[in-house]
From Swiss-Prot:
It comes from the Bacteria. It is a single-pass membrane protein. It comes from Helicobacter pylori (strain J99 / ATCC 700824). Belongs to the YajC family. The chain crosses the membrane at residues 6-26. Keywords: Cell inner membrane, Cell membrane, Membrane, Protein transport, Translocation, Transmembrane, Transmembrane helix, Transport. Pfam families: YajC (PF02699). InterPro entries: Preprotein_translocase_YajC. This is Sec translocon accessory complex subunit YajC. GO terms for cellular component: plasma membrane.
Length: 97
């Protein structure tokens, strides 16, 4: 009975630290990754996105691992889905004034 109590008192602080680590770091990061993945899967033609390089582009076509994007009126490119930072909403679109 004494050994069991010693093991519990030894492992309890480690368990508490693990739970704190999980709820403060791991869980929020997983939720953010899930939200980002859903955003990428929901992108359609005409959506404006910002790449991780800072370019603002318009989605022309969604493929399995890439997007065909329009950089300007006469330039198109393919962008890996891994490099999409976020989607521009109407409220966050920068003004050209």
């Amino acid at each position: 009975m004494g050994q069991t109590k010693e093991i519990i008192t030894t492992l309890l602080p480690l368990l508490v630290l693990f739970l704190i680590f999980y709820f403060l770091i791991v869980r929020p990061q997983r939720q953010q990754q899930k939200k980002h993945k859903e955003m990428i899967e929901g992108l359609t033609k005409g959506d404006k996105i910002v790449t991780q390089g800072g370019l603002i582009v318009e989605v022309l076509k969604a493929e399995a691992n890439f997007f065909s994007v329009k950089l300007n009126d006469d330039t198109t490119a393919k962008l890996s889905k891994n490099y999409v930072a976020f989607k521009l909403d109407e409220e966050t679109t920068p003004n050209n004034n």
